[in-house]
């Protein structure tokens, strides 16, 4: 699995910048196991973005953000909502895969990719 850690929220907000509308894509695999991109973390980021005055136009969690077909299906409604940007809660490969399916829309990472490894337990 790919081990990720959350970027500080200030860094994510700086990436989002002046965007008014944001979509969020989480990862149901590695990032969920690392507690950096599962349902709880997507909800946490949504709350933080809304507290900063952003409108979250959609959220989704792909089974694996590194698998193009699954990401394509999850990105379709997010892209249709016409966000100013997408924040992807996955490893760097997931960010690249999401960007492939969001032409013309900036896609930003909320995580730092650390290394290929294994988790001792969820979140560790």
Tell where the protein language model's regions lie, with residue ranges.
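Iron-sulfur-associated redox domains of electron-transfer enzymes in respiratory
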Residues: 1-124
């Amino acid at each position: 699995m790919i081990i990720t850690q959350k970027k500080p929220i200030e860094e994510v907000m700086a990436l989002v910048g002046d965007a008014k509308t944001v979509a969020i894509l989480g990862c149901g695999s590695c990032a969920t196991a690392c507690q950096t991109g599962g349902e709880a973390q997507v909800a946490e980021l949504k709350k933080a973005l809304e507290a900063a005055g952003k409108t979250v136009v959609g959220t989704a969690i792909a089974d694996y953000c590194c698998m193009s077909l699954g990401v394509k299906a999850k990105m379709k409604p997010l892209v249709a909502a016409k966000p100013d940007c997408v924040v992807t809660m996955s490893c760097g490969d997931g960010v690249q895969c999401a960007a492939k399916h969001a032409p013309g829309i900036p896609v930003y990472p909320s995580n730092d990719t650390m290394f290929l490894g294994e988790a001792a337990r969820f979140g560790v």
